[in-house]
Amino acid sequence: MKDIIEVRGLSLTIGKTAILNDVTVSLEAGKIHGLIGRNGSGKTMLMKCICGFIRPTRGVVVVDGKRVGKDVDFPKNMGIIIETPGFIPYYSGYKNLKLLAGLRNKIGKEEIIQAMERTGLDPKLKRHVKKYSLGMRQRLGLAQAIMEDPDILILDEPMNGLDKDGVEDMRRYLID
């Protein structure tokens, strides 16, 4: 299989602090890859560079043959879960996803409902997101990431706040 993500010579400096230094990695399509490192080692910053949220000081990121920051600002075939997903607190989970789907014209009601159900959330639940547990917000973050059926999922601390059943559901979903 081909490489879906290529990072070549990537460095990131913020102020006078070197966050990443000459990182080179290739990730093959169709496989699960992981970043392991100590707190503060730059894992999240590397993911943000891959996603196009942060421009590296040096180096190249290529996602599915397109250079991030040159050919494309944000790879369209990518779903992302950040460590602490942010949602509009006074909207329901469904309404939050509907709002995001409206920004990406090709996502309809069925895709939203399916994504919520696949992550163990009830699309009919009217509760505001501010009343969701941390685990429910993580599930909603996963639903947001998968509602477009992306080719690539970037997951930053996806198990954060999930109970034992939630962790097992997340693992099962990711393996399937």
Annotate each PLM feature.
Residues I5-V7, L20:
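Conserved structural motif at the start of ABC-family nucleotide-binding domains
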